[in-house]
Amino acid sequence: MAVSLLSPGLKTEFESHAQQELTHADRLASRIQQLGGVPIFNLKELAGKAAAVGNHPEQGTTLTEMVIENLMLERRQVEAYSALIREIEDKDLITREILLEILADTETHASELADFLKRSSDRR
């Protein structure tokens, strides 16, 4: 069955993803503090750091563009978390476990967004 990008399922999925992203941020901030660091909560500072490493998210003007942009960001996060996990190896098992759990959620988010886009395009 085809699914419209306007379907209630997409809204529910975005709400779920947003809640999970907040949980990820809280977990990472707590771990940074446990390790003696200071997490960054200022959005302008975060955006500046993201831009410094080549992340320049675009604001979509249509719902489809927004879903595509979100999917690209999720895929970039998968790459970033995977690289961190490889770098950490067995040096910090607690952080590694947190990152593995977040990676699994992020891979699921990407898969769900790709599925919504595919089903939406199949409908056309």
Predicted stretch roles:
Residues 1-124:
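Iron-associated oxidoreductase/ferritin-like identity signal
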